[in-house]
UniProtKB/Swiss-Prot annotation:
The lineage of its organism: Bacteria, Pseudomonadati, Pseudomonadota, Gammaproteobacteria, Pseudomonadales. The gene is rplX. The keyword Ribosomal protein applies. This is Large ribosomal subunit protein uL24. Keywords: Ribonucleoprotein, Ribosomal protein, RNA-binding, rRNA-binding. NCBIfam families: rplX_bact (TIGR01079). It comes from Stutzerimonas stutzeri (strain A1501). SMART domains: KOW. InterPro entries: KOW, Rib_uL2_dom2, Ribosomal_uL24, Ribosomal_uL24_CS, Ribosomal_uL24_KOW, Translation_prot_SH3-like_sf. One of two assembly initiator proteins, it binds directly to the 5'-end of the 23S rRNA, where it nucleates assembly of the 50S subunit. It comes from the Bacteria.
């Protein structure tokens, strides 16, 4: 079970976007995350009339390593860590500081 999943709100704790918050759009297999509006890079694309792609400079999100982000706890308004707890035979993610479920 992953500690950070798609649609989790995270905060960047290291790098050029330190302190920014965003929502996880995609979790990649190599411990990387794509977060909306964070780690934007410019890609130079060629026009492709066959598929209708217009050329130019396009800004898009690049993946961040999972070690550079922390899950954001809305209750405390701070970065938090994730632990696991078994309730009624199901394993759930909980915030370490408040012991409340992440998905609540």
């Amino acid at each position: 079970m992953q500690k950070i999943r798609r649609n989790d709100e995270i905060i960047v704790i290291a790098g050029k976007d330190k302190g920014k918050r965003g929502k996880v759009l995609k979790v990649l297999a190599d411990d990387r995350l794509v977060v909306g509006g964070i780690n934007l890079v410019k890609r130079h694309t060629k026009p492709n009339p066959m598929s209708g792609v217009q050329g130019g400079i396009v800004e898009k999100e690049a993946p961040l390593h999972v070690s550079n982000v922390a899950i954001f706890n809305g209750e405390t308004n701070k970065a938090d860590r994730v632990g696991f707890k078994v309730e009624e035979g199901k394993k759930i993610r909980v915030f370490k500081s408040t012991q409340k479920p992440v998905d609540a």
